[in-house]
Amino acid sequence: MLSISSLPETVEIVMKFFVVALSVALTSSRLSAQAPVWQPAPGHTQIQIWPGAAPDARPAKGPEFAKSSGKDDLVAGKQVIEIDNVSRPTMTVYSPTGKNTGVAVVVFPGGGYQILAIDLEGTEVCDWLTAKGITCVLLKYRVPAPRSAPYWGAYPQSPIALEDAQRTVGLVRFHAAEYHIDPNKIGVLGFSAGGHLVAAMSTHFDRRLYPNVDAADKESCRPDFAVALYPGHLAMRGNLSELNPDIRTHITRQTPPTFLIQDEDDHVDNVNDSLSYYVALKNAGIPVEMHLYAQGGHAFGLRRTKFPVTAWPQLVETWLGTIGMIAE
């Protein structure tokens, strides 16, 4: 039974509880204000790629947010915008600003399957492609949280990014007439982890990793061409000259023509990631072109540097002409 003498103490405890609760609420509000969600430029809209819950969905570690890199992580003197905790994947369609070639490219930003470098390896790529008359589809694929095992990482460790990629290519092909593109000229382009996703899409298009959702999933998700820049997760860790068997054993005559770029001084993803994939594609008779450079590092995107690799976009444009995607 509560005595009269204990009331002041009880009131004090209750007041402390409400003060703490209010402090937590205010802190959460400040954190939300400091962590904006990425949005594309005006005139462009993110499209949810799944009409309901995404397959293999798991609770995210926290809300999705975007942030800029620090002063020690500049690329060509500029910050990089990264997106974290993506659990609701979207695609954003950027129409050509130049004469429409009918070609479309689905772009996979890199980020180690932990974050997405959405400007360096996303929107800036779309600016280049659309200026060349190519429709760019930027995929914000799921990266639920850093190392949130077992749903973090490259396929087959985690299926979610590949599921999102398969779904997106099918959607683009299904809406080809609406987007004014040729359904037989849809390619994929990715950087780092996104480069691995390019290889996974090039070798895992014959079977969806998820049950069909709608008519778009009846379309082929095979890319008509593939471009991988400084890809990771391809060479075996114990033997860097050997291609990961999950990619190697799925290379067939239907694997699309492929273009590879990497630097020998890449300190994140070993140059053998590209070399091992190149050899496997060549041995399988797949048209493949590879450019290796002595210097240039990792994660340079399209930003101009002093190194020769900075001219890679022109090489890709020439290659697209040689494989019949655009006029030479």
Locations of regions flagged by a protein language model:
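N-terminal cap/lid segment of alpha/beta-hydrolase-fold proteins
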Residues: 35-99
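Short beta-strand element of the alpha/beta-hydrolase
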Residues: 102-110
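Active-site glycine-rich loops that stabilize anionic/oxyanionic intermediates
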Residues: 109-114, 264
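Catalytic nucleophile-loop/oxyanion-hole region of alpha/beta-hydrolase
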Residues: 117-118, 124-125, 139-182, 303-309
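Primarily recognizes the serine-hydrolase "nucleophile elbow" in alpha/beta-hydrolase
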Residues: 163-253
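Acidic catalytic loop of the alpha/beta-hydrolase fold
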Residues: 235, 265-269
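Short beta-strand/loop motif that positions the catalytic acidic residue
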Residues: 260-262
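C-terminal catalytic histidine-bearing segment of alpha/beta-hydrolase fold enzymes
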Residues: 271, 275-328
